[in-house]
């Protein structure tokens, strides 16, 4: 009898069981989309890399061995997306090397990474419809051109605890409602904050996703500059997200169209996992 392993079936049914982890995230995002408020705007789906902290400020500990999705509002913890400058540099180096290698012949992925370096300034104003909501106006720091003016409505978050990794992550779904009347906000009396966060953003794009590595500089009430470093991945085309979500499970659509949403979320989750698994030591 041969001691070598023969080809094996995926299962006794000849198919691979559904990945419940990815399906759970896909179900969550899909539910947020179909139950969102009836307002104009884009649905933003992003994953931020960070740490889940307990009430004492330390990294949360759970008696699980592998990556785990937490039920919303089930555990008293907070998610912190800030990383150290050393982590920021680590990811910057990693992504820059990836951009260079992705343009070489024989690269594992057929799609190279693109790159843009942005310098942005955010300003926040009160919303007339709701004092708790803020209107965010983003300008190009060099030209002063408004690149975005909108109100962000949080729809929901899913926290993912990764005990074997140096970082955790969070999936967030938001509705970005455009606000066209930004021109009327022209005096300092309209500002909510006395600080205007400056964003130094290195934005990498690959296929249907944007990966943003951002240094945010603001001034606290004492006048001391505060610097935060963040890493996030976002689905790049909200229109594609909504169109695939609309056909998910639609038996009148082709199999390819029915499965497109889950395939998009699968790639989104895999990219978030790759970033988390490449996190080095040195988080706050």
Q: Where on the chain are the PLM-derived regions?
A:
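Phosphate-end processing signature that detects enzymes handling 5′-triphosphorylated RNA
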Residues: 1-284
